[in-house]
From Swiss-Prot:
Positions annotated to bind a divalent metal cation: 9, 11, 43
Keywords: Isoprene biosynthesis, Lyase, Metal-binding
Cofactor note: Binds 1 divalent metal cation per subunit.
Descriptive protein name: 2-C-methyl-D-erythritol 2,4-cyclodiphosphate synthase
Family, as annotated: Belongs to the IspF family.
């Protein structure tokens, strides 16, 4: 049996926080605001995985009202989500992810993001695609107010 999941996340860019996307710390004058480390890409991947297995969303599993998740490492959150999928007998067929950001340029970090996500999902790098795009200066991402990410995963039950 195959299951598809889709995830989407947005975080505001603010001064005084590190910018972590796809498990990679990116040098930039702003970072993403959130209860956890606000890794918009790993949050989208986690939501996609939860959607594929019919287990709700990351807000249900890691509520921002719970102090245990304050400044949490999103890689650990995704690892927990993936453990739930594995317990249900799923493996990753592929993941396709898009980061929407006007700045900074993310191309130099894409391969490292792919490697991080592949490791967390116990997959080969070839099973994970990450791409980045802009909105041609339109909307909140185009104005540099925030960054968004989308992810789609295809899982297969063993």
């Amino acid at each position: 049996m195959f299951r598809i999941g889709q995830g989407f996340d947005v975080h505001q860019l603010v001064e005084g926080r590190p910018l972590i996307i796809g498990g990679v710390t990116i040098p930039y004058e702003k970072g993403l605001l959130g209860h956890s480390d606000a890794d918009v890409l790993l949050h989208a991947v986690a939501d996609a995985c939860l959607g594929a297995i019919g287990a709700g969303d990351i807000g249900r599993h890691f509520p921002d009202t719970d102090p245990r998740f304050k400044d949490a490492d999103s890689a650990e959150l995704l690892a927990h989500v993936w453990a739930l999928a594995r317990q249900e007998g799923y493996r990753l067929v592929n993941a396709d992810c898009t980061i929407i950001a006007q700045k900074p340029k993310l191309a130099p970090y894409i391969e490292e993001m792919r490697a991080v996500i592949a490791r967390l999902l116990e997959a080969e790098r070839s099973q994970v695609n990450v791409k980045a795009t802009t909105t041609e200066k339109l909307g909140f991402t185009g104005r540099g107010e925030g960054i968004a990410a989308q992810a789609v995963v295809l899982l297969q039950k063993s």
